[in-house]
Design a protein with these regions (language model features):
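N-terminal glycine-rich phosphate/adenylate-binding segment common to multiple enzyme folds
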Residues: 1-2
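Conserved phosphate/ATP/ADP-binding segment of small-molecule kinases
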Residues: 6-91, 125
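Glycine-rich beta-alpha junction loops
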Residues: 34, 73-77, 97-100, 132-135
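Short, small-residue alpha-helix embedded
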Residues: 36, 101-124
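Short pre-catalytic strand/loop immediately N-terminal to key active-site residues, enriched for Gly-Thr
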Residues: 91-105
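Phosphate-handling active-site elements
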Residues: 91-92, 117-131
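Charged C-terminal helix
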Residues: 125-166
Length: 166
């Protein structure tokens, strides 16, 4: 889901199936809506530090399902955060400046960069920071008048990712 509701076309029966799938993963990347759905919590509607605190609590609770959790898209003051919890090592937090744009596919880009950095040997907080910065750079490179349904303009930003592998 996103923005406090399930994606159109998905039935509520999908939530228990996603829970089962997540229990078999070593890392999950729910956004705030997905985290609420998986835990049976109310949909996110708060902003700022209240949302940050809720996400920290949810991340810890989600480690009962999966050993490593990174909740994305958490409002944190004037920024946006990824709130992580690791069953073995504890909690991590990554904050980046808020880019006031919303485009389809940014979560997919975040996940792709994160996994790439993890495969390069980065620890989760460093991989999450690199992914968050890359997505923010993509958002900044996308004109305000661009169609949000078509995603961000990442092509001009890709060289930064390729020439800065760490």
């Amino acid at each position: 889901g996103d923005h406090g509701r399930m994606y159109r076309g998905l039935a509520p029966e999908m939530v228990p199936a996603m829970y089962t799938l997540c229990s078999r993963a070593s890392l999950i990347l729910p956004n705030t809506t997905d985290a609420a759905l998986l835990l049976g919590d109310p949909m996110p509607g708060v902003t700022g530090e209240a949302e940050l605190h809720t996400a920290q609590t949810q991340a810890q609770r989600l480690t009962r399902i999966c050993p490593r959790v990174l909740i994305t898209g958490v409002a944190a003051g004037r920024g946006i955060a990824c709130v992580g919890a690791d069953r073995a090592t504890g909690e991590s937090l990554v904050r980046t400046p808020m880019v006031p744009k919303s485009f389809h596919g940014t979560g997919d880009i975040f996940g792709a960069v994160l996994v790439g950095r993890l495969l390069q040997g980065n620890v989760l907080p460093a991989a999450a920071q690199a992914a968050a910065v890359f997505v923010a750079d993509c958002l900044k490179a996308t004109p305000d008048e661009a169609d949000e349904r078509l995603g961000v303009w990442l092509e001009s930003v890709l060289p930064r990712l390729m020439h800065n592998p760490e």
